[in-house]
Regions:
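Transmembrane beta-barrel wall of Gram-negative outer-membrane proteins
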Residues: 208-298, 325-327, 331, 394
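Outer membrane beta-barrel strand-and-loop segments of large Gram-negative receptors
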Residues: 381-390, 434-438, 444, 534-538, ...
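Surface-exposed extracellular loop regions of Gram-negative outer-membrane beta-barrel proteins
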Residues: 297, 469-471, 487-545, 562-589, ...
Length: 760
């Protein structure tokens, strides 16, 4: 009943804004010249800002075309994210926040998932360059990492736009882009002095939810001659949720687990500094040197991989238990010539030091603190990239792109390779003193040709070759077609094979986990097992297909896209033992990471944008998932809503005042079908998350030409959800923690926020 009331109230808010906007619309139609005159009176600064925006997406362009979506700096200003940009990226077609499996482990660490392919298949870029810091975090037995992901390295106020690329169009980016790409484009410097200072504060209505404070600055300008620079710094802090936020909502717990609780969302203290020096050494030629440093330290909320606890967990609530230190350095040469030929070349070095308290690696103690001592995981990533774009006017207009990349990842893990042989010795492996080092290289070549066959036909074939030093060769062909159908309709089709190489944990035989039996899929009762890295893994591949039809006229846009990803060789924990220990009274089974032969992801995306008037715009998108399953077992690949509807109604009341309402409706979320031993889920393990909606309101006032103020309310109707535990029941004679099904994350309640942006 309450949900129905909330839906009705949400619609009333939208209709209310329509009711106020309708007479405005009528007045605009009666006096269009007035609006044109007002627009002509913008000052030079405003015009300059608009020109910068037009380079990326003209005002008449829709931001949610099939396969590609764009989020602008203006949208980020009107709807500022609290924690990181994933909060607004999730409102794009095909995007949700999920874990990397159906386990529910680290359930509040949800990350960007595109078209149901999981966070590990979402490639995060900053200014076109990959970010890989999350790979420094250990991969758990079920495929989860205790990480915030890579969406928080750039403060929202420093973002010029965010490009979200889905499906076949993402295949050209190579490793890790099988689901899609999120490209975070930062604001650039100019030839004139400019600076900004921004601050963001929010206040949750419920005191058991963590609040956020953020402030940052930027400065850019000339250095003399042909040199210029850009510098920004950021400091933000989000408090951890209260340790008992889920009290009364947890799944049943007995025996030694009776006093345990699933944790809420952890907090974070984030510090960033980034600088770029640019040299325009010739017409259309530039060289950029960039350096950045970030430190992210968590504020511990009490979370463990299996939602259990010990004294170290209790003693460290609210303290730092892991710290990420990220350094990045790059040199970029961009060149252009009068012929139209352009080139982009860069070298990037990224180093992440993941310093964290030691964790257990066996059974129920996996992912729980085993010591209050810190140990380090160091990940170094080197990337060399070069591409050239060649315009060709032969038979028809073409733009040919040729490129190459070389990437090396090296890891030194002093934390995760220490599991001893509790279940007996493993043939060919040492119980202690295993090497902490692992590495892999990828060499790539790629080509893409944008061929304008006619004024209404664009055909884009592409081919990418990757050689991985461990798993070998991979070919990724692609073909995309855009065909105009008259003046208003466009048909878009694409097919591509995308791929993802195994992680350094999955290929490392020195990375060993142990279970006393509950985690062993095919082992008998009471028989334990090991899980080892596998050097013989294949790369994951996915044949991604989409067909979309789009209608566009006079600011109206409507479209529908069908997508299907035939997923092959997905890497998961093994389903059958490859052997047993060499001695001992009871033989212990040995499993490896293995390739699942086939999986399937399929769904629909729709968009509808309505220009209600010159000042009122209504944008909508919906994603409906048709399939997401392991074709061998029938198991779901992840827990995502059956459908997701995002709707935004924005009204530019005056030149300096705008308001907007947002409405998101999540469909039913179903849990995993089978437990870790392959048996059907039972009892509370089958709990679903019912459909629910989130409504937001915000308003932005440009107080002066240099100061703007945004204030708003997230989750107006206080639609909260609590984490009940992990998906599956675990335990034994000493006690049980019963499964929570899909109820594995927190949805925060009503929150008030204010953001101040200044520039000079």
């Amino acid at each position: 009943m309450n949900k129905k009331i909330n839906y009705s109230l949400a619609m009333l808010i939208n209709l209310g804004i329509y009711g106020v906007a309708a007479p405005v619309f009528a007045a605009e139609q009666a006096a269009p010249a007035t609006a044109q005159t007002a627009a002509a009176n913008n000052d030079d600064t405003q015009n300059h800002a608009e020109e910068d925006t037009l380079i990326v997406t003209a005002a008449a362009q829709n931001l949610q075309a099939p396969g590609v979506s764009t989020i602008t700096a203006e949208e980020l200003k009107k709807r500022p994210p609290a924690r990181d940009i994933s909060e607004i990226v999730r409102t794009m077609p095909g995007v949700n926040l999920t874990g990397n499996s159906t386990s529910g482990q680290r359930g509040n660490g949800r990350q960007i998932d595109i078209r149901g392919m999981g966070p590990e298949n979402t490639l995060i870029l900053i200014d076109g360059k990959p970010v890989t810091s999350r790979n420094s975090v250990r991969l758990g037995w079920r495929g989860e990492r205790d990480t915030r992901g890579d969406a928080s390295w750039v403060p929202p106020e420093m973002v010029e736009r965010i490009e979200v690329i889905r499906g076949p169009a993402a295949a050209r980016y190579g490793n890790g882009a099988a689901g899609g790409v999120v490209n975070i484009i930062t604001k650039k410097g100019t030839g004139e002095w400019h600076g900004t200072w921004n601050t963001y504060l929010n206040a949750p209505e419920h005191k058991d939810e963590g609040s956020t404070k953020r402030t940052n600055f930027s400065l850019n300008g000339p250095l003399g001659g042909d040199f210029s620079f850009r510098l920004y710094g950021n400091l933000d802090k989000t408090q951890a949720d209260a340790w008992d936020i889920n009290q009364g909502h947890q799944s049943e717990r007995t025996g030694i687990y009776a006093d345990t609780l699933p944790a809420g969302r952890e907090g974070v203290i984030n510090k960033d500094i980034n600088g770029v020096v640019r040299w325009d050494f010739a017409p259309m030629q530039s060289l950029e040197l960039e350096a950045g440093y970030s430190r992210q330290g968590n504020l511990y909320s009490g979370d463990t991989q299996n939602t259990n606890t010990n004294q170290i967990v209790k003693d460290n609530y609210g303290k730092e238990t892991n710290r990420l230190y990220r350094q990045s350095y790059s040199m970029t040469w961009n060149g252009g010539w009068d012929s139209g030929l352009t080139t982009s070349n860069w070298v990037q070095y990224e180093h992440t030091r993941n310093s964290r308290m030691r964790e257990g690696l066996a059974g129920g103690t996996e992912g729980i603190f085993s010591s209050d001592k810190f140990s380090d995981i160091d990940l170094s990533d080197v990337l060399l990239h070069s591409e050239v774009n060649i315009p060709i006017d032969f038979v028809f207009n073409q733009n040919l792109t040729l490129g190459t990349e070389w990437n090396q990842q090296k890891m030194k893990d002093l934390s995760s390779n220490g599991q001893t042989f509790m279940g007996g010795p493993i043939p060919g492996s040492n119980s202690t003193n295993r090497s902490p080092y692992s590495q892999a290289e990828i060499f790539s070549l790629f080509a893409e040709d944008n061929m304008e066959l006619t004024d209404s036909t664009m055909l884009t074939p592409g081919l990418r070759f990757d050689h991985h030093s461990i798993v070998g060769n991979n070919w990724s062909p692609s073909l995309n077609l855009s065909q105009g159908l008259g003046d208003d309709f466009t048909l878009k089709m694409g097919i591509a094979q995308a791929y993802k190489a195994p992680s350094l944990y999955q290929t490392n035989p020195n990375y060993i986990l142990y279970s006393k039996g509950q985690g062993c899929y095919a082992s008998g009762t009471g028989v334990g097992c090991y899980m080892m890295g596998n050097e013989d893994l294949k790369a994951e591949t996915s044949v991604n297909k989409e067909i979309g039809l789009e209608f566009k006229r006079d600011g109206w846009l409507a479209g529908v896209t069908w997508f299907r990803n035939d997923y092959k060789d997905k890497i998961e924990a093994g389903y059958a033992p490859i052997g047993q220990t060499s001695s001992g009274k009871t033989k212990t089974d040995i499993y490896q990471w293995e390739n699942i032969p086939k999986a399937l992801v399929e769904g629909l995306e729709g968009t509808l944008n309505v220009p209600v008037s010159n000042t009122v715009n209504w944008t909508n998108n919906i994603t409906y998932m048709l399939e997401s399953k392991n074709k061998e077992t029938g198991e779901r690949l992840s827990v995502i809503p059956e459908y997701t509807l995002n709707s935004t109604l924005s009204w530019q009341i005056r030149q300096d005042i705008s308001v907007q309402s947002t409405f998101t409706w999540y469909g039913k979320q179903q849990p995993k079908k089978y437990n870790y031993k392959g048996l059907p889920a039972t009892g509370t393990e089958t709990n679903e998350v019912s459909p629910y909606s989130i409504v937001g309101l915000s308003g932005t006032w440009d107080a002066t030409k240099n100061v703007s103020l945004t204030t708003g309310i997230d989750n107006v109707f206080d639609e909260r959800h609590w984490r009940a535990g992990n998906a599956q029941t675990t335990g034994g004679n000493a006690g049980y923690m019963y499964g929570a099904g899909a109820e594995t994350y927190n949805e925060s309640g009503r929150t008030y926020y204010v953001s101040v942006n200044t520039h000079f």
